[in-house]
């Protein structure tokens, strides 16, 4: 089984959290709402990987002004690729609290949509299991 270390930002701006609706045909949680993030590359520090993933997935204009390590955990997930193949992966999550100075997001093909969601609205979305656990552990759900 392959192992991946995943950096995961909890991005907040003026009391709202950035969530991404995953593409319906790929990923670990197809079609569900999730935090952004992705795998570390060899030679990267945690923060370098986090900032790269934010740029790749959410665009160059989202200005992250603060990054603070928050938690880590692991689990085993099945990832679905765009061609329909699947793979079981041991995932190690490094989760960070992040503040953004703006909401200027340009998302890539990994996502169907993005939303800035208040704490009160988190429970109205179809959050994936990992994101729901994260927000529950933070006391937001």
UniProtKB/Swiss-Prot annotation:
InterPro entries: Nucleoside_triphosphatase_NudI, Nudix_hydrolase, NUDIX_hydrolase-like_dom_sf, NUDIX_hydrolase_CS, NUDIX_hydrolase_dom. Gene3D superfamilies: Nucleoside Triphosphate Pyrophosphohydrolase (3.90.79.10). It holds the Pfam family NUDIX. Residues 1-141 form the Nudix hydrolase domain. It comes from the Bacteria. It catalyses: a ribonucleoside 5'-triphosphate + H2O = a ribonucleoside 5'-phosphate + diphosphate + H(+); a 2'-deoxyribonucleoside 5'-triphosphate + H2O = a 2'-deoxyribonucleoside 5'-phosphate + diphosphate + H(+); dUTP + H2O = dUMP + diphosphate + H(+); dTTP + H2O = dTMP + diphosphate + H(+). Its cofactor is Mg(2+). GO terms for molecular function: dCTP diphosphatase activity; dTTP diphosphatase activity; dUTP diphosphatase activity; magnesium ion binding. Keywords: Hydrolase, Magnesium. A motif (Nudix box) lies at residues 38-59. PROSITE patterns: NUDIX, NUDIX_BOX. Its EC number is 3.6.1.9, 3.6.1.12, 3.6.1.-, 3.6.1.23. Catalyzes the hydrolysis of nucleoside triphosphates, with a preference for pyrimidine deoxynucleoside triphosphates (dUTP, dTTP and dCTP). Belongs to the Nudix hydrolase family. NudI subfamily. HAMAP family: Nudix_NudI. Monomer. This is Nucleoside triphosphatase NudI. The lineage of its organism: Bacteria, Pseudomonadati, Pseudomonadota, Gammaproteobacteria, Enterobacterales.
């Amino acid at each position: 089984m392959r192992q991946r270390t995943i950096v995961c930002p909890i991005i907040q701006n003026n009391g709202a959290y950035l969530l991404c609706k995953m593409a319906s045909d790929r990923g670990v949680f197809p079609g569900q709402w999730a935090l952004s993030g992705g795998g570390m590359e060899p030679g990267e520090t945690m923060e370098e990987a986090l900032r790269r993933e934010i740029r790749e997935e959410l665009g160059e204009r989202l200005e992250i002004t603060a990054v603070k390590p928050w938690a880590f955990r692991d689990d085993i997930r099945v990832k679905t690729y765009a061609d329909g193949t699947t793979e079981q992966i041991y995932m190690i999550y490094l989760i960070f609290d992040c503040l953004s100075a703006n909401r200027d997001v340009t998302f890539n093909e990994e996502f169907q949509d993005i939303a800035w969601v208040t704490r009160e609205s988190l429970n109205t979305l179809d959050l994936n299991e990992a994101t729901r656990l994260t927000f529950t552990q933070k006391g937001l759900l």
